[in-house]
Design a protein with these regions (language model features):
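C-terminal target-recognition/interaction regions appended to catalytic cores
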Residues: 1-152
Length: 152
């Protein structure tokens, strides 16, 4: 392990999107707090939903559902809690419980898709243990694990 955190790269933002984030931070909330001149035309219509677009992650609350748009600030509440940027690939992966040693391949869109479409590894592991236990094979699993045949 070389100590380098892989895939810790966020998408570049336009000056307009940086201004939007600054206004949201100043006024709190989400895209509804953006001044009219910075709002997208589609957001100016009445009864428009998806108010989480351009939303800032609250570090004191559970993370939003991680989707394939997890690095795009206009796709949901995917703005970094303290910095004017979206989530990096690594931050999104951590929210999905991927170990930092796991390295994603491809461009930003492909890596975001891999993360957003994945079953979180810790959820998969916990589910697998429940299924194994349910099937009455838990003892065999533990024995195989101690022999190094299966890793946790």
């Amino acid at each position: 392990d070389d100590g380098i955190i892989k895939n810790h790269k966020a998408r570049s933002l336009s000056e307009t999107n940086i201004e939007r984030l600054q206004e949201i931070r100043l006024h709190g909330g989400n895209r509804e707090m953006i001044s009219e001149e910075l709002q997208l035309e589609c957001h100016k219509k009445e009864n428009v939903s998806y108010t989480d677009t351009y939303g800032i992650i609250d570090p004191d609350k559970p993370a939003p559902t991680i989707t394939s748009g997890c690095t795009i600030i206009s796709k949901g509440r995917y703005c970094h809690p303290t910095q004017n940027r979206g989530l990096s690939i690594r931050e999104a992966a951590r929210l999905q419980s991927f170990d930092d040693k796991f390295e994603f391949q491809g461009n930003m869109g492909e890596m975001s898709l891999q993360i957003g479409n994945a079953v979180p590894p810790k959820l998969a592991q916990a589910s697998g243990k429940v299924i194994i236990n349910y099937m009455g094979l838990y003892e065999d699993y533990l024995e195989a694990q101690t022999k190094g045949v299966i890793t946790p």
